[in-house]
Amino acid sequence: MEKVKQTIRAPRGTELQTKGWVQEAALRMLMNNLDPEVAEKPEELVVYGGIGRAARNWESYNAIVDSLKTLESDETLLVQSGKPVAIFKSHEDAPRVLLANSNLVPKWANWDHFRELEKKGLMMYGQMTAGSWIYIGTQGILQGTYETFGEAARQHFGGSLKGTLTLTAGLGGMGGAQPLAVTMNGGVVIAIDVDKRSIDRRIEKRYCDMYTESLEEALTVANEYKEKKEPISIGLLGNAAEILPELVKRNITPDLVTDQTSAHDPLNGYIPVGYTLEEAAKLREEDPERYVQLSKESMTKHVEAMLTMQAKGAITFDYGNNIRQVAFDEGLKNAFDFPGFVPAFIRPLFCEGKGPFRWVALSGDPEDIYKTDEVILREFADNEHLCNWIRMARQQVEFQGLPSRICWLGYGERAKFGRIINEMVANGELSAPIVIGRDHLDCGSVASPNRETEAMKDGSDAVADWPILNALINSVNGASWVSVHHGGGVGMGYSLHAGMVIVADGTEAAAKRIERVLTSDPGMGVVRHVDAGYDLAVETAKEKGVNIPMMK
């Protein structure tokens, strides 16, 4: 992959570089994904998650930018694994962009085949929001992480993480949310990463409080704050596959254990035990097969230590990076003895059509986001948990790139919020249009048996029709851009998922599109969980009037 040193930053204000606000939104969000404040390795087009890219290569990136600048408001641009391949006449209510990233026929859906194609320049890894142009930095996963640790606190620690120690690893674009999510819930956390740059970045953005290279110092500080029942987050430089076994040897058991290293990609994501970053990069280049094997062996040790901690009383869960699957394939037969975070903590929210709803101010003006915060506090005042989140986010979350906000809203709530935002753009309360989107990790848009659809009540974990239906209904309902990806979060062969983005530009046409899309999108989550037999989803569907032909 050619590295290009150039600083990409989305335009701000109301001057258009394109032929309409929807095209402008796509252009600005693509560029925002590659803003140095947002992307992990912008010079390689890598946004987050190992090698999750915004475009296949620099030639494709430039062609996408040129295409968006000339795209008419009744045309649709097609993007295949980060490369623009066609512009067709469509209509004004159709998506302006349709994206398909990293999709492989199931028999060939593995890292080896993907890498062959990538080497030939035929494919890229889109992760979830990297290739679909709606990544907003670490805030994008923060509330989900906050909700996860909050639910763990409610289930196991009396509603707060005060006086508890969480141990985790991985401080990249996704995992970097963990330290702040734990301290927001009142806890102490030691978060391990092999890359000092990742820890430094989280400290700079106020997601993590302190840095140390000493396990002794990390434990001393953690114990001191745990006894005081005060929150603190400690970024510890090191390899989790070495540090966790060392803690086991010392008979030190945290209260909560999880992991968000990039274990989904054994070649580009995980660093084997005994290697510096530089040595790992050299081995990756010279002997990728040996690198992958060493990574898998390290992951197995990592999971073994997590299992031992679980046996000693730690609340242990997988945070969706497929590390259990790797360890299982390496012969660790009890790797799945600790649950994934979705069945353990998040599924009830999915049954209500709730998920990580986000919006971005295309103006670049933080005031536009603060005004939308007030809408949440006013319109959803009865939801104290949600309002607390907004208040904390305002104080503690630093914007990366274009100002943005995330919060988990459910069926009915998303459409209501979208309507209000569009009206605020129309009457000039907001200085420019707002982009509304979400993660692919949502209630009705993903099939991922080791993560979002793990342990479904009816055994339908691997059924992948749902994300396809989600993309189809969002497209016909007029989403601004729609994406279908493979392998996000957990790696090749383990997930299919869909994304959508809708632009609130203040027009009446946008109001109608918003109403349709922000109803059908979370509606798919309710439908999917009704179909799987969840009573809470059935109650939600009946209460909200979701039309499900065979619902009992």
Swiss-Prot record:
Record family assignment: Belongs to the urocanase family.
Name of the coding gene:
hutU
Recorded GO molecular functions are:
urocanate hydratase activity
Show the InterPro entries listed in the entry: Urocanase (IPR055351), Urocanase-like (IPR023637), Urocanase_C (IPR035401), Urocanase_central_sf (IPR038364), Urocanase_CS (IPR023636), Urocanase_N (IPR035400), Urocanase_Rossmann-like (IPR035085), Urocanase_sf (IPR036190)
* A matching Pfam family: Urocanase_C
Annotated EC:
4.2.1.49
Report the active site residues: C407
Cellular component, GO annotation:
cytoplasm
Disulphide bridges:
none
**Residues at which NAD(+) binds:** 49-50, 127, 173-175, 193, 239-240, 260-264, 270-271, 319, 489
Q: Which reaction does it catalyse?
A: 4-imidazolone-5-propanoate = trans-urocanate + H2O
Q: In which pathway does it act?
A: Amino-acid degradation; L-histidine degradation into L-glutamate; N-formimidoyl-L-glutamate from L-histidine: step 2/3
Which organism's genome codes for this protein?
A: Bacillus cereus (strain AH187)
Q: Respond yes or no to whether keyword Cytoplasm is given for this record.
A: yes
> What's the record's note on cofactor binding?
Binds 1 NAD(+) per subunit.
Task: Give the organism's phylogenetic lineage.
Answer: Bacteria, Bacillati, Bacillota, Bacilli, Bacillales
Question: What is the protein's name according to its record?
Answer: Urocanate hydratase
Q: Which PROSITE patterns match?
A: UROCANASE
Per its UniProt entry, what is the enzyme's top EC class, as one word? lyase
Give the UniProt record's GO annotations in the biological process aspect: L-histidine catabolic process to glutamate and formamide; L-histidine catabolic process to glutamate and formate
